[in-house]
Regions:
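Active-site acidic/histidine proton-transfer and metal-coordination neighborhood
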Residues: 10-17, 61, 91-210, 216, ...
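Acidic/histidine-rich catalytic cores of soluble enzymes
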Residues: 67-68, 164-267
Length: 304
């Protein structure tokens, strides 16, 4: 179903007293924002072997956080868990542990599975196949959303066309999961460019994951040559959002994030009518990972 038809049926739903989210397969959230934990917040501990990726649900519960966002690379590139276990066995074990601790498997972030925006058709189709395997994995976990990246092309027009093709295929592959793109470097960190891709795909389960901090178009966040305005970017991406990432780096003595105006960001999120999870993604170097997660959680709790 495309967005135009969704809008028509959403309007119709008002006559029978139902919200669009009660008609379609949108998450059945309470009427407020909820806090989840992105696994990347714990990437240092996992890479160092101090925390097993299998214990993510347990760790999240220790913070009093009931929703989790997996990162595929922490089971492949940065650990050997997937070498030891098949994808089926890994998903079974993660699902069991999340159920044991009463944790919602919110989404999974997919990295390193090929260039979905490549102009090399063979390469792009291979990337699509790789991501389809992870869609199956995510569905088995009960995730409502899968996040992917749009890499592989430096020409904007070609990047846009290739991205639309790949996203359309993956969104149609299984309508029971949201396929979303995060602003994650390159053209995707330009809110206008990524919103244009979404407009062209026009499929209801295809959308965005606006990240409060990932708006560096050239370079890295700590050494960036070209920043896109993060508040403008989040505002442009929120109409398509199926998830939101609360990036954080450093906090002052009052508990406020020093690089991002969190109140302004949360106001943008609320104004868009978003009712889902907001995922903590701490990437700072001053506080420990645990301390950064707690600080971000406290700040979000004040604002949501």
């Amino acid at each position: 179903m495309n967005r135009r038809n969704f809008s028509k049926l959403a309007a119709l739903s008002s006559f029978v007293g139902l919200a669009p989210s009660q008609i379609f397969s949108s998450p059945n959230y309470d009427d407020h924002l909820k806090i989840s934990l992105a696994q990347w917040s714990l990437n240092k501990a996992i890479k160092a072997g101090q925390l097993s990726g299998l214990d993510f649900a347990k760790k999240s519960r220790s913070f009093g956080i009931e929703g989790i966002e997996y990162v595929s690379g922490l089971y492949t590139t940065h650990s050997n868990l997937l070498e030891k276990m098949s994808m089926n066995k890994l998903s079974d074990e993660l699902l069991k542990r999340s159920n044991d601790y009463g944790i919602d498997n919110v989404l999974i972030m997919i990295d390193g599975q090929g260039n979905l925006a490549s102009s090399n058709k063979k390469e792009r189709l291979e990337a699509i196949d790789n991501h389809m395997r992870w869609i199956d994995f995510a569905l088995k976990l009960g995730c409502e959303t899968l996040r992917l990246n749009l890499n592989g092309e430096k020409n904007l027009d070609k990047w846009t066309d290739n991205s639309v093709k790949s996203l359309s295929t993956l969104s149609e592959y299984n309508k029971n999961i949201n396929v979303v793109v995060e602003n994650h470097g390159g053209f995707s960190s330009n809110g206008k460019y990524l919103a244009n891709v979404m407009s062209n795909v026009d499929i209801i389960n295809c959308g965005t994951l606006p990240d409060f901090g990932n708006f560096c178009m050239d370079g890295s966040p700590r050494n960036c040559n070209n920043w896109y305005d993060k508040y403008k970017g989040v505002e442009e991406l929120m109409p398509y959002a199926h998830a939101v990432s609360a990036k954080s780096y450093h906090f002052d003595e009052n508990g406020d994030e020093t690089t991002i105006d969190y109140k302004k960001m949360i106001d943008i999120v609320k104004k868009a009518g978003y009712k889902g999870y907001v995922g903590i993604e701490y990437e700072g170097n001053i506080l420990s990972e645990d301390e950064g997660i707690v600080a971000t959680k406290k700040l979000l709790e004040k604002l949501i």
